[in-house]
């Protein structure tokens, strides 16, 4: 029922051809012909794409093994750092700006690709000197800074996989990741500004390292400092001061670990790891198709720490040779036009943001947008959760019209000019797999949909019996493996392949023409403001650290898509749940409502994880508890 209600808000029969792409738009039938050709021999398709990269040793076998143990480009090896950065050395990209960083308080700096390469080598040399070897994990707990990307690229250069951890997580979640990755070095920042307030990142790291028993080194990037450092801590500038040795790039097997994340499952966040060869093939191809070009100035508002921020901030745009904007503040400080100021000031051509952000921004009024000249934008890409049709239209008309007429666009009437494309991505897959492709064969857009499938990904929607369905709600699945198949995964991922295809865990709907609407999770995993949140992780933390039994449910939230409800056994500690979740787990998992129920009910609710309250209110909770789970 709730999936149907989501579909009602998304569904549209409109077919929109943006004036900026009128010259290249094809029918959906023509697009699907190209798509079906790609999945008719999916292995040959990705083999052709793989030849776009430079391989030190070509693969002898395209693919081997049944899912989830499928591996691609067997016996092939490549220099990952070359394919991301060094390949630009002999062309004009080398002297252009690679990264522009702006802090919330207005400070800014920029570096070219050649300067970036120098910094990466310096950090790589320091890591080698500290004893980091290929295969050793490096952890980052920072906002998006130039230094953060330098560390990630230095990790790639020496063959050390990295995991960036979102700073919205608290010390308890950080500690778990430190333990699971067995890292000997952590990079963080002393603090940074968020909505005008100082976020003390270093203090969170200190609590996490103490709680986890971490014995390694903490490298502190000086953002606001200088901080007073402890014996196991060193300033980033001191860590790299003596590092001048030229570091040879690591040549990796295709299946060598590149980076990892902790993905949200029902009972906890679980570590997953992507391979070097398959991921780089997949992210480079999709980055080209979604619209990235070397002359683009690109602004992605999703931070590394989430898959979109890793794939389409750290890797994709730099492989293309684009200029990447990094911003570590909020969209509303000092006012709600901060993002539009950044786009205007730096002549941004491509914006990638989340549905949740646009939902909130659309409710602040049009003038925050219209007072800025956004003519340089040529596409707006959207991801993370369903995008309602009315929010799509607001984005298209208010952000996407601009001031300069183009073909049939009429600025004074806000008719829209550039494409607004909603796309689907998942941490386990690594890249976008649905959406209209700006740099590929482009069909009309249907507002509210996540577009048609992307070539190379065999997508289907199935009912509970595994039968394909059209114009009915089912589960989004992938029928065949993709190049960036995980090389480390939990048992839940194995279970997703149980029936011979990959179950994404998301409800979806497909029109007869082939457009897909992704509707949200069919399990207890929560999607709130674009974040994928594990309910079990919250329950475990509150049990371990407060001693209270809690079950976590989700409710429909018109701003966040879903919000968190905590129902606990009557206890004096129940009143501490909101503050405890902020401190232990991070502000992104703070419940919107805390209620109480008997212990028996708590356990019954945990066994019914697919419950979704249609509104976030005590009345809705009381109704659920009084009427029972039936």
Where do the model's predicted regions map?
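Conserved pre-ATP/AMP-binding loop-to-beta segment of ANL
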Residues: 95-97, 219-221, 225-226, 230-268, ...
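AMP-binding/adenylate-forming catalytic core of the ANL superfamily
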Residues: 140, 165-191, 205, 344, ...
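Adenylate-forming
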Residues: 143, 185-204, 224-225, 328-331, ...
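Structural core segment of the AMP-binding/adenylate-forming
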Residues: 157-236, 354-355, 570-572
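Conserved C-terminal "lid"/linker of ANL adenylate-forming enzymes
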Residues: 217, 526, 553-556, 565-567, ...
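Conserved AMP-binding/adenylation subdomain of ANL enzymes
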Residues: 280-297, 305-350, 363-364
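Conserved AMP-binding/adenylate-forming
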Residues: 379-380, 387-515, 523-525
């Amino acid at each position: 029922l709730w999936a149907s209600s989501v579909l009602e808000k998304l569904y549209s029969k409109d077919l929109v051809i943006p004036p900026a792409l009128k010259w290249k738009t094809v029918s959906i039938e023509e697009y699907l012909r190209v798509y079906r050709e790609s999945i008719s021999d999916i292995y040959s398709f990705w083999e052709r794409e793989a030849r776009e990269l430079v391989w030190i040793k070509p693969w002898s076998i395209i693919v081997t093994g049944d899912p989830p143990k499928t591996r691609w480009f067997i016996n092939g090896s490549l220099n990952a750092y070359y394919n991301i950065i060094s390949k630009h050395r002999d062309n004009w990209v080398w002297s252009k700006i690679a990264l522009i960083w702006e802090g919330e308080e207005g400070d800014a700096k920029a570096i070219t690709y050649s300067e970036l390469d120098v910094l990466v080598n310096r950090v790589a040399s320091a890591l080698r000197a500290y004893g980091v070897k290929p295969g050793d994990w490096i952890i980052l707990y920072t906002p998006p800074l130039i230094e953060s990307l330098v560390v990630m690229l230095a990790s790639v250069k020496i063959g050390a996989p990295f995991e960036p951890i979102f700073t919205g997580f608290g010390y308890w979640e950080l500690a778990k990741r430190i333990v699971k990755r067995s890292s000997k070095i952590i990079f963080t920042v002393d603090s940074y500004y968020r909505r005008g307030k100082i976020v003390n990142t270093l203090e969170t790291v200190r609590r996490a390292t103490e709680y986890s028993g971490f014995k390694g080194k903490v490298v502190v990037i000086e953002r606001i400092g200088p901080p007073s450092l402890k014996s196991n801590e060193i300033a980033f500038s001191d860590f790299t001061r003596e590092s001048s040795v030229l570091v040879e790039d690591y040549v990796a097997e295709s299946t060598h670990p590149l980076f990892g994340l902790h993905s949200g499952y029902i009972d906890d966040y679980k570590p997953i790891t992507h391979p070097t060869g398959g991921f780089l093939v997949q992210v480079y191809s999709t980055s080209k198709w979604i619209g990235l070009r070397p002359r683009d100035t690109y602004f992605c508002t999703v931070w590394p720490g989430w898959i979109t921020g890793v794939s389409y901030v750290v890797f994709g745009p730099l492989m293309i040779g684009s200029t990447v904007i990094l911003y570590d503040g909020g969209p509303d400080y000092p006012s709600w036009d901060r993002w539009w100021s950044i786009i205007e000031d730096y002549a941004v051509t491509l914006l990638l943001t989340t549905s949740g952000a646009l939902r909130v921004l659309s409710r602040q009024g049009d003038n925050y947008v219209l007072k800025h000249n956004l003519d340089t934008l040529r596409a707006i890409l959207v991801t993370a959760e369903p995008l309602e049709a009315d929010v799509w239209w607001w984005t298209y008309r208010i952000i996407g019209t601009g001031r300069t007429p183009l073909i049939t666009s009429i600025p004074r009437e806000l008719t829209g000019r550039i494409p607004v494309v909603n796309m689907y991505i998942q941490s386990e897959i690594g890249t976008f797999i649905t959406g209209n492709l700006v740099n590929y064969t482009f069909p009309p857009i249907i507002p509210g949909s996540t577009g048609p499938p992307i070539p190379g990904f065999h997508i289907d929607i199935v009912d509970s019996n595994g039968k394909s369905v059209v114009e009915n709600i089912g589960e989004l699945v992938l029928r065949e493996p993709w190049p960036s198949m995980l090389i480390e995964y939990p048992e839940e991922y194995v279970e997703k392949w149980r029936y011979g295809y990959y179950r994404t865990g998301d409800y979806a709907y497909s029109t007869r023409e082939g457009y897909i609407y992704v509707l949200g999770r069919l399990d207890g995993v929560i999607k709130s403001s674009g974040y994928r949140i594990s309910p079990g992780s919250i329950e475990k933390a509150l049990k371990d650290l407060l001693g209270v039994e809690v079950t976590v449910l989700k409710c429909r939230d018109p701003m966040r898509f879903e919000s968190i409800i905590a129902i606990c056994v009557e206890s004096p500690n129940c009143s501490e749940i909101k503050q405890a979740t902020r401190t232990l787990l991070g502000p992104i998992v703070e419940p919107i409502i805390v209620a109480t129920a008997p212990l028996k009910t708590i356990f019954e609710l945990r066994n019914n994880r697919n419950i979704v309250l249609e509104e976030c209110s005590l009345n809705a909770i009381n109704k659920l508890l009084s009427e029972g789970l039936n």
